[in-house]
Protein backbone atom coordinates (compact mmCIF):
# COMPACT_ATOMS: atom_id res chain seq x y z
CA UNK A 1 0.00 0.00 0.00
CA UNK A 2 2.63 2.51 1.04
CA UNK A 3 4.70 2.03 -2.12
CA UNK A 4 1.58 2.85 -4.16
CA UNK A 5 0.87 6.03 -2.21
CA UNK A 6 -2.00 4.58 -0.20
CA UNK A 7 -1.94 5.93 3.37
CA UNK A 8 -1.58 3.27 6.06
CA UNK A 9 -2.36 3.71 9.74
CA UNK A 10 -1.98 0.99 12.34
CA UNK A 11 -4.20 1.45 15.36
CA UNK A 12 -5.02 -0.51 18.46
CA UNK A 13 -1.77 -2.35 19.07
CA UNK A 14 -0.80 -3.21 22.59
CA UNK A 15 0.22 -5.64 25.25
CA UNK A 16 -1.82 -6.08 28.41
CA UNK A 17 -0.49 -4.63 31.63
CA UNK A 18 1.62 -7.08 33.58
CA UNK A 19 1.82 -7.88 37.27
CA UNK A 20 5.52 -8.42 37.98
CA UNK A 21 8.83 -6.85 36.99
CA UNK A 22 9.87 -9.59 34.53
CA UNK A 23 6.53 -9.48 32.71
CA UNK A 24 6.67 -5.66 32.65
CA UNK A 25 10.13 -5.82 31.07
CA UNK A 26 8.76 -7.99 28.27
CA UNK A 27 5.76 -5.68 27.84
CA UNK A 28 8.10 -2.69 27.49
CA UNK A 29 10.26 -4.62 25.03
CA UNK A 30 7.25 -5.52 22.87
CA UNK A 31 5.91 -1.96 22.85
CA UNK A 32 9.35 -0.49 22.14
CA UNK A 33 10.01 -2.92 19.28
CA UNK A 34 6.57 -2.40 17.75
CA UNK A 35 6.88 1.40 17.93
CA UNK A 36 10.35 1.31 16.32
CA UNK A 37 9.09 -1.05 13.61
CA UNK A 38 6.22 1.33 12.92
CA UNK A 39 8.56 4.33 12.65
CA UNK A 40 11.13 2.45 10.56
CA UNK A 41 8.56 1.62 7.90
CA UNK A 42 6.72 4.95 8.08
CA UNK A 43 3.43 3.55 9.34
CA UNK A 44 1.82 5.75 12.01
CA UNK A 45 0.47 3.75 14.93
CA UNK A 46 -1.18 4.25 18.29
CA UNK A 47 -1.29 2.16 21.42
CA UNK A 48 -4.57 0.62 22.53
CA UNK A 49 -5.73 2.16 25.81
CA UNK A 50 -9.13 0.99 27.04
CA UNK A 51 -8.81 2.55 30.50
CA UNK A 52 -9.01 -0.82 32.29
CA UNK A 53 -6.70 -0.60 35.31
CA UNK A 54 -4.82 -3.49 36.87
CA UNK A 55 -2.94 -6.38 35.31
CA UNK A 56 -4.06 -9.29 33.18
CA UNK A 57 -6.46 -9.93 30.33
CA UNK A 58 -7.80 -6.82 28.62
CA UNK A 59 -6.03 -4.47 31.08
CA UNK A 60 -4.75 -1.69 28.84
CA UNK A 61 -4.76 1.47 31.00
CA UNK A 62 -1.85 3.78 30.24
CA UNK A 63 -3.21 7.35 30.33
CA UNK A 64 -6.09 8.36 32.62
CA UNK A 65 -8.82 9.46 30.22
CA UNK A 66 -10.15 12.03 32.68
CA UNK A 67 -6.93 13.72 33.77
CA UNK A 68 -4.37 12.99 31.05
CA UNK A 69 -1.94 11.67 33.69
CA UNK A 70 -0.20 8.30 33.56
CA UNK A 71 -2.26 5.58 35.25
CA UNK A 72 0.75 4.15 37.09
CA UNK A 73 4.53 4.15 37.23
CA UNK A 74 4.46 0.97 35.12
CA UNK A 75 2.27 2.64 32.48
CA UNK A 76 4.66 5.59 32.36
CA UNK A 77 7.63 3.24 31.93
CA UNK A 78 5.86 1.46 29.06
CA UNK A 79 5.07 4.72 27.26
CA UNK A 80 8.61 6.02 27.85
CA UNK A 81 10.02 2.81 26.32
CA UNK A 82 8.00 3.52 23.19
CA UNK A 83 9.09 7.15 23.07
CA UNK A 84 12.80 6.22 23.25
CA UNK A 85 12.35 3.91 20.27
CA UNK A 86 11.60 6.88 18.02
CA UNK A 87 15.17 8.17 18.26
CA UNK A 88 17.01 8.07 14.94
CA UNK A 89 20.16 6.52 16.40
CA UNK A 90 18.29 3.46 17.70
CA UNK A 91 17.78 0.61 15.21
CA UNK A 92 15.49 -2.41 15.29
CA UNK A 93 18.61 -4.50 15.81
CA UNK A 94 19.50 -2.39 18.88
CA UNK A 95 16.06 -2.99 20.35
CA UNK A 96 16.27 -6.73 19.59
CA UNK A 97 19.75 -7.08 21.13
CA UNK A 98 18.48 -5.52 24.36
CA UNK A 99 15.50 -7.83 24.76
CA UNK A 100 14.89 -9.15 28.28
CA UNK A 101 16.43 -12.53 28.98
Language-model region placement:
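Glycoside hydrolase catalytic-domain groove-lining segments
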Residues: 1-16, 39
Amino acid sequence: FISKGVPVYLGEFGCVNRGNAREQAFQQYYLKYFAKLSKTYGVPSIIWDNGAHGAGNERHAFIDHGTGEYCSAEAKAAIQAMITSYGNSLTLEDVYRNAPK
